[in-house]
Amino acid sequence: FEQHNPHHNLDLFNHIISVVSKVPADLELRYTALLHDIAKPLVQTFDENGVAHYKTHEIVGADMARDILTRLKLPVKLIETVEDIIKKHMVLYRDVTDKKFNKLLSEMGYDNLLRLIEHCNADNSSKNNEVVNPENDLHERLKRAVEKQMQVTVNDLALNGKDLIDMGFKGTEIGKIKGELLDKYLSEEIPNEKE
């Protein structure tokens, strides 16, 4: 399947083989690499210059991967991880702000964001290097984001359990709210203030 896009110098089959060979030997990553572009033939469109585009291939591909891996009776956690990484595998190709990066870390957790980075690095290095720069600082950004998260816990939030009780919250609601506040703070959606 020819990709008809300047970002790719390999056909789809050889691109996938290249990505699979470049990801670390991790089962979730290997399945992700194998299936990440599976929807490209279904969603391919051409612009007026004859250049192919694959909008939504990551969304359609994540659904297809989930169906395939479910039929193979693989563990649910593995299926969910592969589906999530495929769904997000185009996110890191755009300029990702620190806020968005921290939000990804909060949503995915360290292990799966690291897998996403490893996948994207293998994917990028399997493209046309005259058009795509395979160099990035994603590993360093992950390290910085983790260090930031390790420095802040729910106990460091300006709004504490007593404040929430005074607002009328009870029991397990308090822990849930504090966890949500921490996630929002770490993804820079809110400041660490009582207001």
Regions found by a protein language model. Name each.
Residues F1-N121, V131:
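Conserved, hydrophobic alpha-helical core segments of structured domains
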Residues D67-R71, S126-E195:
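Charged substrate- and nucleic-acid-binding regions of tRNA-handling and nucleotidyl-transfer enzymes
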